[in-house]
Design a protein with these regions (language model features):
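Helix-loop junctions at the membrane interface of multi-pass solute transporters
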Residues: 65-66, 101-107, 237-240
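Predominantly cytoplasmic-facing regulatory/coupling regions of multi-pass membrane proteins
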Residues: 1-81, 130-222, 229-235, 243-278
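Alpha-helical architecture
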Residues: 95, 120, 124, 187, ...
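Hydrophobic alpha-helical segments and helix pairs
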Residues: 99-139
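Hydrophobic alpha-helical transmembrane segments of multi-pass membrane transport proteins
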Residues: 73-107, 114-117, 220-225
Length: 278
């Protein structure tokens, strides 16, 4: 029941922000911006984003294996792709993580509550690293930058994250390696974003754009695949970034499209489940 309510809420939020964003754009100017995009760059951005998901899936596999849930790379990545597709293309469904948990329980007879808890831990570590990057960039751009102070702040936040994982999830071993997995994952996603910016002819203001991107990633959980919210946050940041509303919104839109393209392979495994998952 709770999952159904959350799914309905996600649909409402997605529709609202898509409508609000579109209503505040000159669509002819938006299409003009998109029409100048080299499709090759979008394919490259999507491919790079896809590689970040490989690292993200390996972070989850590491967390699972450390808790005695042994799964092969092929099995885990296939389940990860299925989850990505569910999250992006099936509004009102049970959600990608919930479906992954169900499949793991069915295939490996793993305790469902434990798997759900580990999937939550995986998400929380990724979110924590994003917040650390966000705070670091804020310090660099908006405050009087002090390298030593920045390092001390990030170390302090990392230690807090370590003890939170230890306290809440009763796990002392996985935090630091998972932290590095997350850092690599987000770095590759930033590279994907840079390719999109290059395709739009944007050559400066990258730090500010990354901050907006991180904020859109954090809040994207409230809509399906970040659709609507990501574009709205970029639209709202147009004046800060010194971009036209259409150019700013197109950054979020193109990243959403590249993420959607990267999620499509999951459909193959939903239509025809491989033998190693039966």
């Amino acid at each position: 029941m709770k999952n159904k309510i959350f799914s309905i809420l996600q649909i409402v939020i997605t529709v609202f922000f898509v409508y609000f964003t579109v209503s505040n754009l000159d669509l002819s100017k938006l299409f003009e911006v998109l029409n100048n995009i080299n499709i090759l760059y979008l394919i490259i951005a999507a491919s790079i984003y896809f590689s970040s998901q490989i690292i993200s899936s390996e972070r989850l596999r590491y967390i699972l294996s450390d808790n005695k849930f042994i799964i092969s790379f092929k099995q885990n990545f296939t389940l990860y792709l299925i989850g990505l597709f569910y999250n992006f293309f099936i509004p009102g469904g049970i959600g990608g993580d919930a479906y992954k948990s169900y499949l793991m329980n069915k295939k490996f007879n793993w305790k469902l509550s434990k798997v759900v808890k580990l999937l939550l831990l995986d998400r929380m570590i990724g979110l924590g690293v994003l917040c650390c990057i966000l705070i670091g960039l804020y310090e660099i751009i908006f405050l009087n930058f002090n390298f030593i102070y920045l390092i001390l702040t990030l170390c302090f936040l990392s230690i807090i994250g370590y003890y939170m994982v230890k306290l809440i999830f009763k796990n002392q071993n996985i935090f630091w390696k998972s932290f590095l997995y997350s850092l690599a994952n987000h770095t590759i996603q930033f590279i994907s974003l840079f390719i999109i910016l290059y395709s739009l002819g944007i050559e400066d203001g990258y730090f500010e754009i990354i901050i907006v991107f991180i904020l859109s990633s954090i809040f994207s959980v409230f809509s399906f695949g970040g659709i609507g919210i990501r574009e709205y946050i970029f639209l709202s940041s147009a004046s800060i970034l010194n971009f036209s509303p259409e150019l700013s919104a197109s950054i979020g839109l193109l990243f959403t499209i590249s993420a959607a393209i990267s999620s499509l392979p999951g459909l193959k495994f939903i239509i025809s489940k491989p033998d190693y998952l039966k």
